[in-house]
Protein backbone atom coordinates (compact mmCIF):
# COMPACT_ATOMS: atom_id res chain seq x y z
CA UNK A 1 0.00 0.00 0.00
CA UNK A 2 2.84 2.37 0.84
CA UNK A 3 4.49 1.68 -2.53
CA UNK A 4 1.27 2.57 -4.35
CA UNK A 5 0.94 5.86 -2.45
CA UNK A 6 4.56 6.75 -3.23
CA UNK A 7 3.96 6.07 -6.92
CA UNK A 8 0.83 8.22 -6.80
CA UNK A 9 2.75 11.10 -5.20
CA UNK A 10 5.39 10.88 -7.93
CA UNK A 11 2.71 10.89 -10.63
CA UNK A 12 0.97 14.02 -9.31
CA UNK A 13 4.05 15.89 -8.05
CA UNK A 14 3.96 18.16 -11.09
CA UNK A 15 0.44 19.37 -10.31
CA UNK A 16 -0.23 22.49 -8.23
CA UNK A 17 -3.00 22.54 -5.58
CA UNK A 18 -5.56 23.52 -8.23
CA UNK A 19 -4.67 20.55 -10.42
CA UNK A 20 -2.86 22.53 -13.11
CA UNK A 21 0.05 20.75 -14.79
CA UNK A 22 3.25 22.72 -14.18
CA UNK A 23 5.63 20.08 -15.49
CA UNK A 24 6.02 21.77 -18.88
CA UNK A 25 8.06 24.96 -18.79
CA UNK A 26 7.95 26.77 -22.13
CA UNK A 27 11.32 27.76 -23.56
CA UNK A 28 12.36 31.37 -23.10
CA UNK A 29 11.46 33.45 -26.12
CA UNK A 30 14.38 35.01 -28.02
CA UNK A 31 14.78 38.73 -27.50
CA UNK A 32 13.62 40.91 -30.39
CA UNK A 33 13.98 44.57 -31.22
CA UNK A 34 10.48 45.13 -29.76
CA UNK A 35 11.14 43.38 -26.44
CA UNK A 36 12.12 46.50 -24.52
CA UNK A 37 8.78 48.07 -25.45
CA UNK A 38 6.87 44.96 -24.33
CA UNK A 39 5.42 44.62 -27.82
CA UNK A 40 5.01 41.12 -29.20
CA UNK A 41 3.39 39.73 -32.31
CA UNK A 42 -0.06 39.45 -30.73
CA UNK A 43 0.07 43.09 -29.60
CA UNK A 44 1.03 44.28 -33.07
CA UNK A 45 -1.79 42.20 -34.50
CA UNK A 46 -4.23 43.70 -32.00
CA UNK A 47 -3.07 47.21 -32.88
CA UNK A 48 -3.62 46.44 -36.56
CA UNK A 49 -7.13 45.13 -35.88
CA UNK A 50 -7.91 48.26 -33.84
CA UNK A 51 -6.60 50.47 -36.65
CA UNK A 52 -8.79 48.70 -39.20
CA UNK A 53 -11.80 49.00 -36.90
CA UNK A 54 -11.20 52.71 -36.32
CA UNK A 55 -10.80 53.36 -40.04
CA UNK A 56 -14.00 51.52 -40.96
CA UNK A 57 -16.00 53.02 -38.10
CA UNK A 58 -14.79 56.58 -38.68
CA UNK A 59 -15.35 56.31 -42.43
CA UNK A 60 -18.89 54.98 -42.00
CA UNK A 61 -19.71 57.64 -39.40
CA UNK A 62 -18.34 60.61 -41.32
CA UNK A 63 -19.47 59.54 -44.79
CA UNK A 64 -23.09 59.29 -43.62
CA UNK A 65 -22.82 62.55 -41.68
CA UNK A 66 -21.16 64.44 -44.56
CA UNK A 67 -23.80 63.38 -47.09
CA UNK A 68 -26.65 64.28 -44.72
CA UNK A 69 -24.99 67.64 -44.05
CA UNK A 70 -24.68 68.25 -47.80
CA UNK A 71 -28.39 67.55 -48.27
CA UNK A 72 -29.38 69.81 -45.37
CA UNK A 73 -27.28 72.72 -46.65
CA UNK A 74 -28.29 72.30 -50.30
CA UNK A 75 -31.92 73.37 -50.00
CA UNK A 76 -32.32 76.66 -51.83
CA UNK A 77 -35.36 77.51 -49.72
CA UNK A 78 -33.13 77.88 -46.67
CA UNK A 79 -30.75 80.44 -48.15
CA UNK A 80 -32.68 83.35 -46.65
CA UNK A 81 -31.58 82.25 -43.17
CA UNK A 82 -28.02 82.60 -41.85
CA UNK A 83 -26.08 79.39 -42.50
CA UNK A 84 -26.69 76.73 -39.88
CA UNK A 85 -29.41 78.68 -38.06
CA UNK A 86 -32.59 77.44 -39.77
CA UNK A 87 -34.37 75.07 -37.34
CA UNK A 88 -35.05 72.36 -39.92
CA UNK A 89 -31.53 72.54 -41.28
CA UNK A 90 -30.03 72.49 -37.79
CA UNK A 91 -32.05 69.50 -36.58
CA UNK A 92 -31.29 67.49 -39.73
CA UNK A 93 -27.55 68.05 -39.37
CA UNK A 94 -27.59 67.30 -35.63
CA UNK A 95 -29.62 64.12 -36.09
CA UNK A 96 -27.38 63.05 -38.96
CA UNK A 97 -24.22 63.29 -36.88
CA UNK A 98 -25.82 61.91 -33.72
CA UNK A 99 -27.32 58.80 -35.30
CA UNK A 100 -24.28 58.21 -37.53
CA UNK A 101 -21.88 58.09 -34.60
CA UNK A 102 -24.35 56.02 -32.58
CA UNK A 103 -24.66 53.09 -34.97
CA UNK A 104 -20.97 53.29 -35.93
CA UNK A 105 -19.96 52.90 -32.27
CA UNK A 106 -22.38 50.01 -31.83
CA UNK A 107 -20.86 48.30 -34.87
CA UNK A 108 -17.17 48.75 -34.06
CA UNK A 109 -16.93 49.19 -30.28
CA UNK A 110 -16.15 45.49 -29.96
CA UNK A 111 -13.40 45.73 -32.59
CA UNK A 112 -11.45 48.86 -31.66
CA UNK A 113 -13.38 50.57 -28.87
CA UNK A 114 -15.22 52.88 -31.25
CA UNK A 115 -13.53 56.19 -30.42
CA UNK A 116 -13.85 57.51 -34.02
CA UNK A 117 -12.40 60.83 -32.88
CA UNK A 118 -8.79 61.84 -32.03
CA UNK A 119 -10.04 63.96 -29.11
CA UNK A 120 -11.99 61.03 -27.66
CA UNK A 121 -8.93 58.80 -28.10
CA UNK A 122 -6.86 61.34 -26.16
CA UNK A 123 -9.36 61.44 -23.30
CA UNK A 124 -9.36 57.63 -23.16
CA UNK A 125 -5.57 57.64 -23.07
CA UNK A 126 -5.49 60.20 -20.25
CA UNK A 127 -7.97 58.06 -18.31
CA UNK A 128 -5.71 55.03 -18.93
CA UNK A 129 -8.50 53.20 -20.70
CA UNK A 130 -6.11 52.71 -23.63
CA UNK A 131 -2.32 52.84 -23.83
CA UNK A 132 -0.44 55.78 -25.41
CA UNK A 133 0.67 53.43 -28.19
CA UNK A 134 -2.94 52.45 -28.94
CA UNK A 135 -3.94 56.12 -28.87
CA UNK A 136 -1.37 56.99 -31.54
CA UNK A 137 -2.30 53.91 -33.56
CA UNK A 138 -5.94 55.05 -33.53
CA UNK A 139 -5.19 58.64 -34.55
CA UNK A 140 -3.78 57.79 -37.98
CA UNK A 141 -6.72 55.72 -39.29
CA UNK A 142 -9.19 58.22 -37.83
CA UNK A 143 -7.58 61.13 -39.69
CA UNK A 144 -7.13 59.14 -42.91
CA UNK A 145 -10.73 57.90 -42.72
CA UNK A 146 -11.94 61.49 -42.29
CA UNK A 147 -10.19 62.55 -45.49
CA UNK A 148 -11.39 59.43 -47.32
CA UNK A 149 -14.98 59.99 -46.20
CA UNK A 150 -14.82 63.64 -47.24
CA UNK A 151 -13.47 62.74 -50.66
CA UNK A 152 -16.06 60.00 -51.16
CA UNK A 153 -18.94 62.24 -50.09
CA UNK A 154 -17.71 65.03 -52.37
CA UNK A 155 -17.34 62.67 -55.35
CA UNK A 156 -20.74 61.03 -54.87
CA UNK A 157 -22.83 64.18 -54.41
CA UNK A 158 -23.22 66.91 -57.04
CA UNK A 159 -22.48 70.55 -56.38
CA UNK A 160 -20.23 72.22 -53.87
CA UNK A 161 -18.89 70.73 -50.67
CA UNK A 162 -21.30 72.00 -48.03
CA UNK A 163 -20.14 70.13 -44.95
CA UNK A 164 -17.09 72.20 -43.98
CA UNK A 165 -16.63 73.93 -40.63
CA UNK A 166 -16.74 77.72 -40.58
CA UNK A 167 -17.38 80.48 -38.06
CA UNK A 168 -20.78 82.13 -38.36
CA UNK A 169 -23.32 84.40 -36.69
CA UNK A 170 -20.54 86.88 -35.89
CA UNK A 171 -18.56 84.37 -33.81
CA UNK A 172 -14.91 85.38 -33.26
CA UNK A 173 -11.96 82.99 -33.26
CA UNK A 174 -11.56 83.15 -29.48
CA UNK A 175 -15.25 82.40 -28.92
CA UNK A 176 -15.08 79.64 -31.49
CA UNK A 177 -12.11 78.10 -29.69
CA UNK A 178 -13.93 77.96 -26.36
CA UNK A 179 -17.14 76.71 -27.96
CA UNK A 180 -15.21 73.87 -29.59
CA UNK A 181 -13.43 73.13 -26.32
CA UNK A 182 -16.59 72.92 -24.22
CA UNK A 183 -18.55 71.06 -26.91
CA UNK A 184 -15.80 68.44 -27.11
CA UNK A 185 -15.58 68.27 -23.31
CA UNK A 186 -19.28 67.38 -23.16
CA UNK A 187 -18.76 64.61 -25.70
CA UNK A 188 -15.60 63.22 -24.07
CA UNK A 189 -17.04 63.35 -20.56
CA UNK A 190 -20.07 61.42 -21.79
CA UNK A 191 -17.73 58.77 -23.17
CA UNK A 192 -15.77 58.53 -19.91
CA UNK A 193 -18.85 58.36 -17.69
CA UNK A 194 -20.86 55.91 -19.81
CA UNK A 195 -18.21 53.71 -21.46
CA UNK A 196 -15.18 53.77 -19.14
CA UNK A 197 -16.94 53.75 -15.77
CA UNK A 198 -18.05 50.24 -14.81
CA UNK A 199 -21.84 50.24 -14.93
CA UNK A 200 -24.61 47.85 -15.83
CA UNK A 201 -25.56 50.14 -18.72
CA UNK A 202 -22.13 50.13 -20.42
CA UNK A 203 -23.53 48.15 -23.33
CA UNK A 204 -25.80 51.12 -24.12
CA UNK A 205 -23.00 53.72 -24.08
CA UNK A 206 -23.45 54.45 -27.80
CA UNK A 207 -26.89 55.93 -27.09
CA UNK A 208 -25.85 58.77 -24.70
CA UNK A 209 -22.73 59.38 -26.80
CA UNK A 210 -24.89 59.90 -29.87
CA UNK A 211 -27.22 62.16 -27.91
CA UNK A 212 -24.29 64.23 -26.62
CA UNK A 213 -23.01 64.74 -30.19
CA UNK A 214 -26.55 65.68 -31.25
CA UNK A 215 -26.72 68.30 -28.49
CA UNK A 216 -23.25 69.61 -29.37
CA UNK A 217 -24.42 70.18 -32.95
CA UNK A 218 -27.59 71.88 -31.78
CA UNK A 219 -25.51 74.27 -29.67
CA UNK A 220 -22.50 74.91 -31.91
CA UNK A 221 -23.49 74.53 -35.57
CA UNK A 222 -24.59 78.13 -36.05
CA UNK A 223 -21.38 79.47 -34.51
CA UNK A 224 -18.56 77.10 -35.54
CA UNK A 225 -20.16 74.48 -37.76
CA UNK A 226 -19.47 72.01 -34.93
CA UNK A 227 -16.12 70.34 -35.34
CA UNK A 228 -15.52 68.67 -31.93
CA UNK A 229 -13.54 66.13 -33.98
CA UNK A 230 -10.27 67.04 -35.75
CA UNK A 231 -10.73 64.17 -38.22
CA UNK A 232 -14.15 65.53 -39.19
CA UNK A 233 -12.85 69.09 -39.69
CA UNK A 234 -9.76 68.03 -41.64
CA UNK A 235 -11.67 65.65 -43.89
CA UNK A 236 -14.15 68.34 -44.86
CA UNK A 237 -11.42 70.93 -45.44
CA UNK A 238 -9.46 68.55 -47.68
CA UNK A 239 -12.58 67.69 -49.69
CA UNK A 240 -13.38 71.38 -50.19
CA UNK A 241 -9.70 72.26 -50.79
CA UNK A 242 -10.21 75.18 -48.45
CA UNK A 243 -8.49 75.80 -45.12
CA UNK A 244 -9.62 78.97 -43.34
CA UNK A 245 -6.91 80.84 -41.44
CA UNK A 246 -8.63 79.85 -38.18
CA UNK A 247 -8.68 76.11 -38.98
CA UNK A 248 -6.42 75.58 -35.97
CA UNK A 249 -9.34 76.14 -33.57
CA UNK A 250 -10.83 72.84 -34.78
CA UNK A 251 -7.71 71.07 -33.53
CA UNK A 252 -6.70 73.00 -30.42
CA UNK A 253 -10.28 73.35 -29.15
CA UNK A 254 -11.14 69.63 -29.21
CA UNK A 255 -7.79 68.61 -27.71
CA UNK A 256 -8.26 71.11 -24.88
CA UNK A 257 -11.78 69.76 -24.46
CA UNK A 258 -10.38 66.25 -24.03
CA UNK A 259 -8.12 67.53 -21.23
CA UNK A 260 -11.05 69.35 -19.61
CA UNK A 261 -13.26 66.25 -19.69
CA UNK A 262 -10.47 64.12 -18.24
CA UNK A 263 -9.89 66.70 -15.46
CA UNK A 264 -13.53 66.50 -14.38
CA UNK A 265 -13.50 62.70 -14.55
CA UNK A 266 -10.22 62.52 -12.62
CA UNK A 267 -11.59 64.81 -9.90
CA UNK A 268 -14.51 62.43 -9.43
CA UNK A 269 -12.07 59.52 -9.16
CA UNK A 270 -10.03 61.36 -6.53
CA UNK A 271 -13.20 62.04 -4.55
CA UNK A 272 -14.06 58.32 -4.88
CA UNK A 273 -17.62 59.23 -5.73
CA UNK A 274 -18.77 55.64 -6.27
CA UNK A 275 -18.19 54.77 -2.61
CA UNK A 276 -20.45 57.57 -1.40
CA UNK A 277 -23.08 56.98 -4.07
CA UNK A 278 -23.27 53.28 -3.17
CA UNK A 279 -23.42 54.15 0.54
CA UNK A 280 -26.34 56.51 -0.07
CA UNK A 281 -28.13 53.85 -2.09
CA UNK A 282 -27.61 51.30 0.68
CA UNK A 283 -28.87 53.76 3.30
CA UNK A 284 -31.94 54.50 1.19
CA UNK A 285 -32.74 50.81 0.84
CA UNK A 286 -32.47 50.32 4.61
CA UNK A 287 -34.95 53.14 5.20
CA UNK A 288 -37.38 51.59 2.74
CA UNK A 289 -37.07 48.22 4.48
Curated annotation (Swiss-Prot):
Gene Ontology terms for molecular function: water channel activity
Main location: endoplasmic reticulum
Motif NPA 1 per UniProt: ranges: 117-119
Membrane-spanning ranges: 48-68, 91-111, 136-156, 176-196, 203-223, 248-268
InterPro entries noted in UniProt: Aquaporin-like (IPR023271), Aquaporin_transptr (IPR034294), MIP (IPR000425), MIP_CS (IPR022357)
Protein localization: Endoplasmic reticulum membrane; Cell membrane
Function: Water channel required to facilitate the transport of water across membranes. Involved in freeze tolerance, osmotolerance and cell flocculation in liquid cultures. Is non-functional in most laboratory strains.
Cytoplasmic side: 1-47, 112-135, 197-202, 269-289
Inducers of expression: During exponential phase in rich medium and repressed in minimum medium, hyper-osmolar medium or in sporulating conditions.
Protein name (database record): Aquaporin-2
Segments on the Extracellular face: 69-90, 157-175, 224-247
Superkingdom: Eukaryota
Keyword annotations of the record: Cell membrane, Endoplasmic reticulum, Membrane, Repeat, Transmembrane, Transmembrane helix, Transport
Motif (NPA 2): 229-231
Topology with respect to the bilayer: Multi-pass membrane protein
Keyword Endoplasmic reticulum: yes
Family: Belongs to the MIP/aquaporin (TC 1.A.8) family.
Region (Disordered): 1-36
Entry domain remark: Aquaporins contain two tandem repeats each containing three membrane-spanning domains and a pore-forming loop with the signature motif Asn-Pro-Ala (NPA).
Species of provenance: Saccharomyces cerevisiae (Baker's yeast)
GO CC, one annotated term: plasma membrane
Coiled-coil regions, chain positions: none
Amino acid sequence: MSNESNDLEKNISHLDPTGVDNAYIPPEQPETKHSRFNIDRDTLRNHFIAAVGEFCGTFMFLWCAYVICNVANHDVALTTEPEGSHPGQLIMIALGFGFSVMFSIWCFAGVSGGALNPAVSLSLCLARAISPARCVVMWFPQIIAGMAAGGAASAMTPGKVLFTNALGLGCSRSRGLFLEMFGTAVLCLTVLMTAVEKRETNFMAALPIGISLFMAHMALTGYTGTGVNPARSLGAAVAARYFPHYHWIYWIGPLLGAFLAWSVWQLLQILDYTTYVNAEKAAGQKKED
